[in-house]
Curated annotation (Swiss-Prot):
This is Phosphoenolpyruvate carboxylase kinase 2. Keywords: ATP-binding, Kinase, Nucleotide-binding, Pyruvate, Serine/threonine-protein kinase, Transferase. ATP binds at residues 17-25, 40. It holds the Pfam family Pkinase. The lineage of its organism: Eukaryota, Viridiplantae, Streptophyta, Embryophyta, Tracheophyta. Expressed in flowers and roots, and at lower levels in cauline leaves. Barely detectable in rosette leaves and stems. Residues 11-269 form the Protein kinase domain. Its EC number is 2.7.11.1.
Amino acid sequence: MTREFELENNYQLCDEIGRGRFGTITRCFSPATKEFYACKTIDKRVLIDALDRECIETEPRIMAMLPPHPNIIRIFDLYETEDSLAIVMELVDPPMTIYDRLISAGGRLSESESASYAKQILSALAHCHRCDVVHRDVKPDNVLVDLVSGGVKLCDFGSAVWLGGETAEGVVGTPYYVAPEVVMGRKYDEKVDIWSAGVVIYTMLAGEPPFNGETAEDIFESILRGNLRFPPKKFGSVSSEAKDLLRKMICRDVSRRFSAEDALRHSWMMNVGNLQSN
């Protein structure tokens, strides 16, 4: 619901908990609900072009189309003026992304923790894809982690698109996580998210993405070569089931690449609760 900028009338703004390309994220409190939320405030004056404006308008529009899901961040309120846009969202406290978690864990996660997060990410993507929504920027920075509950939430739908039974096009996303069909400029569907999620899972297990380079062009070339490897130094203690799922998600042949539902039915995902920490 978009309204005139009455944010301060309904929420008490507290401390800054994050900063993005277009603005800040602040913890805020609602006297009406007695709960804390996250408020993303965007300064429209820093928007450079139509693409920037489309990006900030896309997130609330797409998320309004999605029924609530436990692994997708929720939007509760929207306030707008000529110069500002404020989005009041569900708060994960303390705020931590999978990227932050990787750093705090020393660079990589145990197989059991990785599998737990992977299952929740795939559940969120399956929900999006059933609604014909493609996220297009699945990466560690866009998955929030609640260390107390072990829950994760997919966030930042600024690059998302509703397919409406069609395909999408355009190079969107973050180089390390972009699917090869996107790099090649082809039309694509929701399976680009599966490739990206596979790269996120690989990164959690190995501490680095499978395709690297010093520049975006170098990374894209590595992606197009598509040589998925599991170095023993990084994957020596990782189960064969985990590596099998990664091969089926980080698969250049889109027709053979798993869907989110396929991945959730894989044996590695079915046995999440039985995996031991390593």
